[in-house]
Amino acid sequence: MDTSRTSLFLCSVLYSLQLVGSARPGKQHRSCPTPCECEQDGMLVRVDCSDRGLTGLPRNISIFTSYLDLSMNNITKLPSNALHNLHFLEELRLAGNDLTYIPKGAFAGLGSLKVLMLQNNLLRQVPSEALQNLRSLQSLRLDANHISYVPPSSFNGLFSLRHLWLDDNSLTEIPVRALESLSALQAMTLALNKIHHIPDYAFGNLSSLVVLHLHNNRIYSLGKKCFDGLHSLETLDLNYNNLDEFPAAIKTLKNLKELGFHSNNIKSIPEQAFIGNPSLITTHFYDNPIQHVGRSAFQHLPELRTLILNGASQITEFPDLTGTTSLESLTLTGAQLVYLPSAVCNQLPNLKVIDLSYNHIKDLPSFSGCQRLQKIDLRHNEVYEIRFTTFQQLVGLRSLDLAWNKIAVIHPSSFSSLPSLIKLDLSSNHLTSFPVTGLHGLTHLKLTGNSALQDLIPSEHFPKLRVMEMPYAYQCCAFAVCENLKHSGQMNKDENSSADDFYRKDIGLLHLQDDRDFEDFLLDFEEDVKVLHSVQCTPSAGPFKPCDHLFGSWLTRIGVWLIVLLSFVCNALVIATVFRPLSYVPSIKLLIGLIAIINTLMGLSSGVLATVDALTFGNFAQYGAWWESGVGCQITGFLSVFAAETSVFLLTVAALERGFSIKCTTKFETKSSFLSVKLSIVFCFLLSIIIAVSPLMSGSTYGTSPFCFPLLFGDPSSMVFMVALVLLNSLCFLVMTVAYTKLYCSLEKGELENVWDCSMVKHIALLLFTNCILYCPVAFLSFSSLLNLTFISPEVNKSILLLIIPLPACLNPLLYILFNPHFKEDIGSLKNGDMLWSRSRHTSFASVSSEDAEKQSCDSTQALVTFASSSISFDLPATSSSSSYQMSNNYKLSAVAFVPCH
């Protein structure tokens, strides 16, 4: 008291003298040190010299300075007695300099100093001589240095010290002797050091210590009496160490309120582990390889508010919490719990939050005794049934998460007594129906992943709903999402952004609950709900998930029906003429006939879609989910892919066959084998079947859209599959183009007209050109989707899917019917019973097979091809009527005349 009065008196006298001196004529007030900033604080001065590039102490510091900040400079040393005249200095900051040593007397004369900051320097030991006799010092920061040694006399005379920072240094042991003199110390941190062991009575004289941080060390063992003497300790942090055993030494800490020892190697929590800590409020010990927890470990902790046991993978039995009646938040995730005791709520009447996610719980007890529950998290368990009594009378429950279970049965009145429930997550279960009773207050509803839940959910039961996730987009139609899209078109970008942000925030809510207070979560939740005034439903309806009509526009509808009718009629004519009875079918006509059959299958798949559109006209949303997930859609998708791929492959074989045939004919070589063509056809069919089956074998389905075809955008697996098909088909078209280009270039100029004009060669060229042109939009859209180019609207994609892809199914036979003269001959033969190919084998040109004759026939002119004397081998097909057709002879010909085939 005498010292304080003397200092105050001296301050008053000196201040008066300063005022008098400053009032003299010609005298000015003493200025602030040159690089610093000063601020008057009553009779005293606050001097800020931080981050000024100083290499030493500034001169002319006022003796009335109470606060001096010299941090973030380049000061390397402090001279002795440099600050001895600053008797009123209470806070000195020297952080962030290059001090390696502080000599004795550096702080001499600082009898009023209360706060000394020396962090972020280069000190290798505590400057014990410089710190002695700072009797008023209350806070000392020595963190973030290189201190590896604390002399025993370091803190002698620091009788008023309350806070000590020694973290982020290189200490390897507790400075036991140095701490003996700090009986008034209240908070100390020794974190981020290299301490291995805490000996007995390490803090024996720190009876006033309230907070002790020892986290991020290398502590692997504790003395059984290492915490003896810490009678006032309330917070103990042992996180991020190498402890192998539960710290049994905490039993002496009767006033302990907060305990953390997570992220260690503790494998067991013994029985009655906290028997000596009746004041414990919060404990964290997640991220330990805990294999065993004593049932009585958490008994009789009447003040415990929070219990977190994350990652205790070997816990198989729910802990006995008798006497722990104040528990408000219980987290026990990633364990092996199979059941919950029926008395869990009797033991925990004040429970507000319970998180038992990532366990193996199969049966739930009644939570009706937990009247204060606000949040229940049971996701990723094995719950099968929700009974009537499971959540009865939980009037305060606001969030219920039951996602990723096996729930197949929910009692119709399970949620009838939950008036405060605003968030319900039942995604990824096995639901076939959803009870709506009592859910009128919901704002968030998640039912995605329940593929068997196909019924529409009435919107009138959810007047406050703002965000919802459904198994199918059609279920969003009931909430006017489709109508809003129709009337408003594309929503405003700002509205979309706010909705997306809200949705993303909603997705992350449950993940934030471990780190945020639940009350704050609810406040933020309610504020976000007020921002959005319309229902945000996903997956959203659109052209590929229509609400009313499968095809949408009448133009598309008429176009599809026209394609279907033409494909049936025209392909039937081609098939009838090619495969007419008792006629010989050469390889090229066999390929054309098979393409017609495949085109009929493509028309059939489009016809199925057209029929579904007609049957569900104006009300497709009611049947959309049923159609997508049904067998009919799978078969339709299989036929579409199979027909599309087989058609391309057979066309490729036809192009190659024409090239080889013409080459053999013009060079008088042996003609290509019919057997090789048949083998190629079989290979095409097998490859198409493999491609069409691959989506089903890979776990995917054709039911990603109601059109039962892999989409050009959206689902990644479908898009990858579609791009792979486009690449394969593009390769086929490239091969065909190269083959025909090579054929054109290889023919001599004189022979070009005679050979190139042949009907079948021209027909395959026409098919190649037409199919290639029609496939360009499909390829372009596929690569656009792969590159995330969104300038093409979904309506255009839909038109391509429904019209362009099946269009070859009707164009291919039309081209044959309209432009190939063989069709006229074949249809005439079909009428009159004549067989053109049979007749050609009985003409005067019996030395040439009908297939070779067809190759050389021309559609409009009579061709005369003169061959040089050569040897030609002919293989005629066998017939049952005459063995004379089975022959292989060599003929010497000088010239062969061909009659026109018209």
UniProtKB/Swiss-Prot annotation:
Membrane topology: Multi-pass membrane protein
UniProt-recorded Gene Ontology molecular function terms: protein-hormone receptor activity; transmembrane signaling receptor activity
Pfam families: 7tm_1 (PF00001), LRR_8 (PF13855), LRRNT (PF01462)
Cytoplasmic side: 579-589, 656-678, 740-763, 820-902
Gene Ontology CC annotation, any one: trans-Golgi network membrane
Signal sequence bounds: 1-22
Compartment(s) of residence: Cell membrane; Golgi apparatus, trans-Golgi network membrane
PROSITE patterns given in the database record: G_PROTEIN_RECEP_F1_2, LRR
Glycosylation (residues): N60, N74, N205, N496, N788, N797
InterPro entries (UniProt xref): GPCR_Rhodpsn, GPCR_Rhodpsn_7TM, Gphrmn_rcpt_fam, Leu-rich_rpt, Leu-rich_rpt_typical-subtyp, LRR_dom_sf, LRRNT
Membrane-crossing residue ranges in chain numbering: 558-578, 590-610, 635-655, 679-699, 719-739, 764-784, 799-819
Cystine crosslinks: C32-C38, C36-C49, C345-C370, C476-C537, C633-C708
Residue ranges of LRR repeats: 41-61, 62-85, 86-109, 111-133, 134-157, 159-181, 182-205, 207-229, 230-253, 254-276, 278-300, 301-324, 325-347, 348-372, 374-393, 394-417, 418-441, 598-619
Tissue expression as described in the entry: Expressed in the developing epithelial stem cells of the intestine.
Main location: membrane
One annotated GO biological process: positive regulation of canonical Wnt signaling pathway
Extracellular side: 23-557, 611-634, 700-718, 785-798
Domain LRRNT positions: 32-61
Keyword set, alphabetical order: Cell membrane, Disulfide bond, G-protein coupled receptor, Glycoprotein, Golgi apparatus, Leucine-rich repeat, Membrane, Receptor, Repeat, Signal, Transducer, Transmembrane, Transmembrane helix
Family: Belongs to the G-protein coupled receptor 1 family.
Role according to the record: Receptor for R-spondins that potentiates the canonical Wnt signaling pathway and acts as a stem cell marker of the intestinal epithelium and the hair follicle. Upon binding to R-spondins (RSPO1, RSPO2, RSPO3 or RSPO4), associates with phosphorylated LRP6 and frizzled receptors that are activated by extracellular Wnt receptors, triggering the canonical Wnt signaling pathway to increase expression of target genes. In contrast to classical G-protein coupled receptors, does not activate heterotrimeric G-proteins to transduce the signal.
Name this polypeptide is given: Leucine-rich repeat-containing G-protein coupled receptor 5A
The organism of origin for this protein: Xenopus laevis
